[in-house]
């Protein structure tokens, strides 16, 4: 199973402007809120070729920083997947990233274990200049490669989604590099943005409920589909996975829906802690 969230909700998922790569950090129009959130996972639906009996798990999402000092993310997703007939797999994905406020530098490190055995470790960095993006991997194997200048990093991605939502747009297509999986993949993404949910409408029933800061903010239902670049195109493309959530204008996400194709997992925000943002000097 591909157990992951694009570091938008977050990455991602959870996190998901004009081009912030060219804007000064102090001029960034979207202010992302430092916060720590916990999401409880459970199986919502199972269909297709792979039958999943149950999914239990949790996501810990710890986002800190500012446009001036850069953004850091500590992410952990632990999932127990029961495929029936006594076959249970425990997946433990840990990731740490840092992205500067101008979206010119990005560092990433992740480790994925299945049944306590490491199956994937990635470590690397990416830097943007006028001509493109250069990536240096130290794990899983040393490797250097270049990417198109149009690709965006995870925090920049969420800022672009929020900016598009604020502008009343319903679709946003971007190529995203988040250092996930083998560390060398770029995903073509399509964000579908629903109608704005104004403060006081459709009150949340999770940890966001009663939070005075969030109660005063707009939010949007968003679904982001991730397509592997370079995959064979035969008719209508099927996304590698999709992430649905409600996105607040400060970057906090709730009501997650992780669609892996053969099954869908829901993520309910069970804890939320807002942190103070450091003032730009």
Where are the language model's segments positioned?
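Beta-strand elements of well-folded, non-transmembrane domains
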Residues: 41-45, 61-67, 79-83, 97-101, ...
């Amino acid at each position: 199973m591909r157990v992951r969230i694009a570091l938008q909700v977050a990455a991602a998922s959870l996190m998901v402007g004009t081009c912030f790569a060219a804007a000064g950090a102090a001029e960034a129009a979207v202010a992302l809120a430092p916060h720590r959130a916990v999401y409880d996972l459970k199986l919502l639906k199972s269909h297709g070729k792979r039958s999943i009996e149950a999914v239990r798990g949790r996501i810990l999402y710890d986002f800190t920083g500012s446009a001036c000092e850069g953004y850091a993310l500590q992410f952990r997703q632990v999932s127990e997947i029961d495929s029936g007939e006594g076959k249970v797999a425990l997946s433990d994905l840990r990731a740490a990233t840092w992205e500067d406020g101008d979206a010119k530098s990005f560092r990433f490190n992740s480790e994925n274990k299945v049944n306590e055995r490491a199956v994937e470790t990635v470590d690397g960095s990416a830097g943007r200049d006028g001509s493109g993006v250069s990536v240096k991997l130290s794990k899983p194997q040393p490797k250097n490669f270049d990417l198109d200048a149009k690709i965006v990093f995870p925090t920049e991605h969420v800022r672009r989604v929020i900016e598009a939502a604020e502008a009343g747009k319903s679709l946003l297509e971007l190529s995203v590099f988040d250092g996930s999986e083998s560390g060398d993949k770029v995903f073509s993404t399509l964000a579908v943005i629903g109608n704005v949910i104004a403060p006081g409408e459709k009150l949340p029933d999770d940890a966001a409920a009663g939070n005075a800061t969030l109660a005063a903010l707009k939010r949007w239902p968003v679904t982001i589909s991730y397509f592997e670049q370079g995959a064979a195109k035969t008719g209508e493309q099927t996304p590698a996975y999709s992430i649905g959530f409600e996105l607040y204008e400060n970057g906090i996400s709730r009501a997650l829906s992780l669609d892996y194709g053969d099954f869908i997992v829901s993520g309910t925000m069970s804890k939320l802690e807002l942190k103070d943002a450091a003032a730009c000097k």
